[in-house]
Amino acid sequence: MMGHRPVLVLSQNTKRESGRKVQSGNINAAKTIADIIRTCLGPKSMMKMLLDPMGGIVMTNDGNAILREIQVQHPAAKSMIEISRTQDEEVGDGTTSVIILAGEMLSVAEHFLEQQMHPTVVISAYRMALDDMISTLKKISTPVDVNNREMMLSIINSSITTKVISRWSSLACNIALDAVKTVQFEENGRKEIDIKKYARVEKIPGGIIEDSCVLRGVMINKDVTHPRMRRYIKNPRIVLLDSSLEYKKGESQTDIEITREEDFTRILQMEEEYIHQLCEDIIQLKPDVVITEKGISDLAQHYLMRANVTAIRRVRKTDNNRIARACGARIVSRPEELREDDVGTGAGLLEIKKIGDEYFTFITDCKDPKACTILLRGASKEILSEVERNLQDAMQVCRNVLLDPQLVPGGGASEMAVAHALTEKSKAMTGVEQWPYRAVAQALEVIPRTLIQNCGASTIRLLTSLRAKHTQESCETWGVNGETGTLVDMKELGIWEPLAVKLQTYKTAVETAVLLLRIDDIVSGHKKKGDDQNRQTGAPDAGQE
């Protein structure tokens, strides 16, 4: 009979899961990712050692760096890793907290789904809670004077204490603050702080970490092109080019038929004259240094050397932009169009030093640099990479405070204050939504709880007394001292976090939880390529994504 035959809509190669199974699978995947980096929160955090596919070693406790290296299969786990990257790009800090918080938000929702509560009810309660969380955070935030150096250093320090670099915290804080203050650029009342482009971190293995410093200028890994050129110039006049000082060959292939010997000599002579003219155009401005992104021919080197001009070639475009910002030069594409105001005179010194086996060009003592280089020294590549990651976080924290000078207390204090506010508000609520709403308050406590666990103190006793403390008047700055596992007033301890980071953490965590709760069906198909081969070899689920 026809009626009993099953109707196949989806291809037989696809695998489909739906309903409760999907939701619990997503929640478990999110919890697993959160558990991986739970121990990386706070000053007593552990490090993770990861092997990348190329066989290199990554040692870090930075949430984003760990998750970047992990290969995952589950789609929900992939979206969790994605939020850590978003957090890192947006505010540069709080990558570990956002994953732990999102995992916990999903974990507390599981209980309601088991009781057959509809996901949309949970979602609307979460969204309501997010609005209240944001308003409570803004209430407990305090403004900060960005010109107060001591205060700025203590803010950066509270970000650094959770990292490897905490042993050299005062050095790192000063480096981060100086670097960010250098690249800060104000135009028409608009602040711009582009750390990625203009604050470059150069890592040179060798020496000790105490040798690290911020250069008021730029350092590039290049030597002069001719051994007889000057390597130490005070107040240099710098010309920056992005064209080559070589004979220009035509775009398309050209054939020249030469019948007489004089013609060949003339062609060579024309090449020489062309290069000579290029060099003359540059030399008439009397520069001390010519830096180009392209090549410099031997003949051009000879002319420049005779004019006592130092030349450096094949510099990266990004480095050239930084040099332009540091010494006030303008990058020129055609040497014949060079004018006096294209020459950079802002640098105080150009010198070439040998560090280890390599030569480095230092353009320092700039009058008003808008770009800088952070020179890092250390024992090994792994340590240097971790220190660089820590410094990037510190600089991002500094940038966030300069752009939005509002602070909230750290050490789990703001989480407890927000949780207390949500619990109080939920008492006045009616209907089924009050339970998921209250669960958000419970989920927020995961941050202080993890801090207590990571320093080996008694979780139940401390968390209960912290909860009791927050019910009292004007105690919203009390939190956990991650070093000792005791309760302290964060105002006295001086541990603050930028409001921008906290807001982004909460928004991202709740949005991700909401996104994953909305999923009730996962259809995973096979890849088209290699399907037949997989069937022949009998590889189980080889093409499955």
From Swiss-Prot:
<feature type="binding site">
    <location>
        <position position="411"/>
    </location>
    <ligand>
        <name>ADP</name>
    </ligand>
</feature>
<feature type="cross-link" description="Glycyl lysine isopeptide (Lys-Gly) (interchain with G-Cter in SUMO2)">
    <location>
        <position position="248"/>
    </location>
</feature>
<feature type="modified residue" description="Phosphotyrosine">
    <location>
        <position position="247"/>
    </location>
</feature>
<feature type="binding site">
    <location>
        <position position="93"/>
    </location>
    <ligand>
        <name>Mg(2+)</name>
    </ligand>
</feature>
<feature type="modified residue" description="N-acetylmethionine">
    <location>
        <position position="1"/>
    </location>
</feature>
<feature type="binding site">
    <location>
        <position position="94"/>
    </location>
    <ligand>
        <name>ADP</name>
    </ligand>
</feature>
<keyword id="KW-0378">Hydrolase</keyword>
<keyword id="KW-0007">Acetylation</keyword>
<protein>
    <recommendedName>
        <fullName>T-complex protein 1 subunit gamma</fullName>
        <ecNumber>3.6.1.-</ecNumber>
    </recommendedName>
</protein>
<dbReference type="InterPro" id="IPR002194">
    <property type="entry name" value="Chaperonin_TCP-1_CS"/>
</dbReference>
<dbReference type="InterPro" id="IPR053374">
    <property type="entry name" value="TCP-1_chaperonin"/>
</dbReference>
<comment type="similarity">
    <text>Belongs to the TCP-1 chaperonin family.</text>
</comment>
<feature type="region of interest" description="Disordered">
    <location>
        <begin position="1"/>
        <end position="24"/>
    </location>
</feature>
<comment type="function">
    <text>Component of the chaperonin-containing T-complex (TRiC), a molecular chaperone complex that assists the folding of actin, tubulin and other proteins upon ATP hydrolysis. The TRiC complex mediates the folding of WRAP53/TCAB1, thereby regulating telomere maintenance. As part of the TRiC complex may play a role in the assembly of BBSome, a complex involved in ciliogenesis regulating transports vesicles to the cilia.</text>
</comment>
<feature type="binding site">
    <location>
        <position position="482"/>
    </location>
    <ligand>
        <name>ADP</name>
    </ligand>
</feature>
<feature type="binding site">
    <location>
        <position position="96"/>
    </location>
    <ligand>
        <name>ATP</name>
    </ligand>
</feature>
<feature type="binding site">
    <location>
        <position position="411"/>
    </location>
    <ligand>
        <name>ATP</name>
    </ligand>
</feature>
<feature type="binding site">
    <location>
        <position position="95"/>
    </location>
    <ligand>
        <name>ATP</name>
    </ligand>
</feature>
<feature type="binding site">
    <location>
        <position position="97"/>
    </location>
    <ligand>
        <name>ADP</name>
    </ligand>
</feature>
<comment type="subunit">
    <text>Component of the chaperonin-containing T-complex (TRiC), a hexadecamer composed of two identical back-to-back stacked rings enclosing a protein folding chamber. Each ring is made up of eight different subunits: TCP1/CCT1, CCT2, CCT3, CCT4, CCT5, CCT6A/CCT6, CCT7, CCT8. Interacts with PACRG. Interacts with DNAAF4. Interacts with DLEC1.</text>
</comment>
<feature type="binding site">
    <location>
        <position position="163"/>
    </location>
    <ligand>
        <name>ADP</name>
    </ligand>
</feature>
<feature type="modified residue" description="Phosphoserine">
    <location>
        <position position="11"/>
    </location>
</feature>
<dbReference type="GO" id="GO:0005832">
    <property type="term" value="C:chaperonin-containing T-complex"/>
</dbReference>
<dbReference type="GO" id="GO:0032212">
    <property type="term" value="P:positive regulation of telomere maintenance via telomerase"/>
</dbReference>
<feature type="binding site">
    <location>
        <position position="96"/>
    </location>
    <ligand>
        <name>ADP</name>
    </ligand>
</feature>
<feature type="cross-link" description="Glycyl lysine isopeptide (Lys-Gly) (interchain with G-Cter in SUMO2)">
    <location>
        <position position="15"/>
    </location>
</feature>
<feature type="region of interest" description="Disordered">
    <location>
        <begin position="526"/>
        <end position="545"/>
    </location>
</feature>
<keyword id="KW-0460">Magnesium</keyword>
<dbReference type="GO" id="GO:0005874">
    <property type="term" value="C:microtubule"/>
</dbReference>
<feature type="binding site">
    <location>
        <position position="42"/>
    </location>
    <ligand>
        <name>ATP</name>
    </ligand>
</feature>
<dbReference type="GO" id="GO:0051082">
    <property type="term" value="F:unfolded protein binding"/>
</dbReference>
<keyword id="KW-0832">Ubl conjugation</keyword>
<keyword id="KW-0143">Chaperone</keyword>
<feature type="binding site">
    <location>
        <position position="42"/>
    </location>
    <ligand>
        <name>ADP</name>
    </ligand>
</feature>
<feature type="binding site">
    <location>
        <position position="483"/>
    </location>
    <ligand>
        <name>ADP</name>
    </ligand>
</feature>
<dbReference type="InterPro" id="IPR027409">
    <property type="entry name" value="GroEL-like_apical_dom_sf"/>
</dbReference>
<dbReference type="GO" id="GO:0043209">
    <property type="term" value="C:myelin sheath"/>
</dbReference>
<dbReference type="GO" id="GO:0007339">
    <property type="term" value="P:binding of sperm to zona pellucida"/>
</dbReference>
<dbReference type="GO" id="GO:0002199">
    <property type="term" value="C:zona pellucida receptor complex"/>
</dbReference>
<feature type="binding site">
    <location>
        <position position="94"/>
    </location>
    <ligand>
        <name>ATP</name>
    </ligand>
</feature>
<feature type="modified residue" description="Phosphoserine">
    <location>
        <position position="170"/>
    </location>
</feature>
<feature type="binding site">
    <location>
        <position position="497"/>
    </location>
    <ligand>
        <name>ADP</name>
    </ligand>
</feature>
